[in-house]
Regions:
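Helix-turn-helix
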Residues: 23-26, 30-68, 72
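Hydrophobic/aromatic residues within well-ordered alpha-helical segments
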Residues: 23, 66, 73, 77, ...
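Hydrophobic/aromatic-rich alpha-helical bundle segments in the mid-to-C-terminal region
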Residues: 127-131, 135, 148-222, 228-230
Length: 230
């Protein structure tokens, strides 16, 4: 056939020309976009196939189940986010880094975490990814607390224990702020900052005075979740 008589390529044939890594990346990013609008529980393999523009069987070639796929999507987003977070924190002084990490994150970012917590009880692969990245977050905060104490700005007999405590406080406040809307942004930050200052022996008001921008909430490029109602 010459060029004029050759049929145009289909979406599936274009997908077939992509590398394995490119196909997998497309599928994961499409899943994240769907999670942003439908939640983890609302995503099906057929939805993802339609979003990517491929046949259903191609999705199953890379992910044996819906549970495996949504876990991979969450894992990809958080791994990308935390890598960016670490780079940002490393460029800040210790006190500003602490304030940046503890600052309330954008609503669209935390709603995905809250939705993941809700779905994890029914999706073991997602629960495993959630647990792994929760520990990653605790380790990042532990490192920041260690930097604060090493600079002589605060005290901590056990940075890891203080990290677990402050992570629990920040998560609880985030639920009340983002999911329940019973406290506003200023109050949410004030609660977490005040408890952190007391726990670490910091000068009262020092975290707010650091005037930080949130260090978290930068999802993977082209897959940033949009706000949705829970």
């Amino acid at each position: 056939l010459d060029n004029e008589s050759r049929p145009p390529p289909t979406l599936d044939s274009v997908a077939e020309r992509k590398t394995s890594d490119e196909r997998r990346d497309d599928i994961v990013r499409a899943t994240l976009r769907l999670v942003a609008t439908k939640g983890f529980a609302g995503v099906t393999l057929r939805d993802v196939a339609t979003e990517v523009g491929v046949v259903h069987g191609l999705i199953r070639h890379y992910f044996a189940s819906r549970d495996e796929l949504v876990a991979a999507a969450f894992d990809f987003a958080v791994t990308t986010e935390l890598s960016s977070d670490r780079a940002q924190l490393d460029g800040l002084d210790p006190l500003t880094a602490l304030a940046a990490w503890l600052s309330s994150t954008p609503e669209d970012h935390y709603r995905v975490w809250i939705d993941a917590w809700s779905e994890a009880a029914r999706t073991p692969p997602l629960a495993a990814a959630l647990d792994r990245h929760h520990r990653d977050c605790e380790r990042i905060l532990t490192d920041v607390i260690t930097r604060v104490t090493a600079a002589g700005l605060g005290i901590s007999a056990d940075p890891a224990a203080d990290s677990r405590l402050l992570t629990a406080v920040a998560d609880g406040v985030a639920v009340q702020h983002h999911a329940m809307a019973v406290i506003g942004l200023a109050e949410a930050n004030a609660i977490v900052f005040t408890i952190a200052e007391r726990q670490l022996g910091l000068t009262p008001g020092s975290l707010a005075q650091a005037n930080p921008a949130p260090a978290r909430g930068l999802w993977a490029e082209d897959a940033a979740p949009a706000p949705r109602a829970l």
